[in-house]
Amino acid sequence: MRADGGTGGRAFSYGIKAGLVLAAALSGAVPHVLAQDRPPVRLSGRSPDSELTVYLMTMGPGKQVWERFGHNAIWIHDPVRGTDQTYNYGLFDFRQQNFLLRFVQGRMWYWMQGFSAQSYVESYRRANRSVWVQELEIPPQARRELQRFLEWNEQPENRFYHYDYYRDNCSTRVRDALDRALSGQIREGTARAATGRTYRFHTQRLTSNDPPVYTGLLLALGHPVDRPISKWEEMFLPLALRTHIRNLQVTGPNGGKIPLVRSERTLFQSTEPEPPADPPFWVPSYLLGGLVIGGSAFGLGVTAGQQRMSRTGFLVVTWIWLLLTGVAGMVLAGLWGLTDHTAAYHNENLLQMNLLALPLLWLVTRLILGSARAAKPAAVLAAGVAAISLIGLLLKPFPQFYQVNGAIIALALPAHAGIAAGVWRLARLQDPRTRRSPARASG
């Protein structure tokens, strides 16, 4: 099954994702500028290059998480051939050899392909996703070179590329192809222009409609996504590419500066609301969750000596939390050490999602079952896990620890602290030195 992969965090969010299936030819909903069914134009005395029109086509976000980042393509209108071809860099195939292994390793292969502009627009119209086009002011000879490049790029031996969620995705490929046609003027005008935003900023705001995915990405992404990015880098988002080229000036035929965008049109306007402009501030919610987990563990640990239900409850709470954090720690360590998912490298969340949670889980189970020998190791290890979580918080003032993970700390630290306190209480009950001896009867 072939799928339209889209951009950025969509692949990272779900990995294996279904895309749009191109629809049949449009039946009148798209303006007359689409000329797929018109005969070739016969020119008299004019260069065929001058008749080419190049558009940036941008598709707005959809409802699903993997659609929230938008999409884009390059549209070439060629009246000489009588064609309207849209070139899409966001395709992948579930049937590719070792597809799942490549995804896990961060070595996904995507490809580009041309489609009828009519059917392409119609597929997004049916999905209720906005479609905008911008006619670009590119010199005639460069338009022809761009068309040749895209046709070359579409050949089976040239179409595949190693997909990276932020640095080399379907939008950056469109950006780079246009920049190539303009002799590097897009990069020149945007590479040093700061945005004050980061890759994580955009990932958070665009996944805020799905809290589990939001949390998973907040956990999995490390330092690389928290540095400020330029306008050039921000064009990993199709809508950012659309915005930034709108304000860009390029060299015109007379040597002066002219706007890159000659005109803009909306081919279809979605009825869906726009994504939020900023990420949500959910730290209090995560803190509340951490306090509930930690408070429950501590309360159950205090009463576990007298009530069997409390011991069972303590075991359930600690099992769920420690299993989740231990497995999460394994995943984070694996992403950093064993894969090409560079966005997950140098992840401070390893101080919160601690691999030591797994041996602690085993010790806590033995402690609950009455093992006195497990009491001290369990208490020491639980305190160590909580201390490491606290260290993650105390390191935040230092400039080297700039990862945006306050919400994860707010969740993990109270939970680890509450479990450590509950384990310490149970360990004291199992320690023979703290058990009261039966009172001796007098005379």
Segments and roles (model prediction):
Residues M1-Y14:
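N-terminal secretory signal peptides that target proteins for export/translocation
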Residues K17-A29:
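Bacterial N-terminal signal peptides
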Residues L34-P275:
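Soluble extramembrane regions of membrane proteins in the secretory/endomembrane system
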Residues V41-S44, S50, T251-G255, Q306-G313, ...:
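Intrinsically disordered, low-complexity coil segments
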Residues L248-T342, Q352:
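Core alpha-helical transmembrane segments of integral membrane proteins
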Residues L323-G443:
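Generic detector of multi-pass transmembrane helix bundles and their immediately adjacent loops
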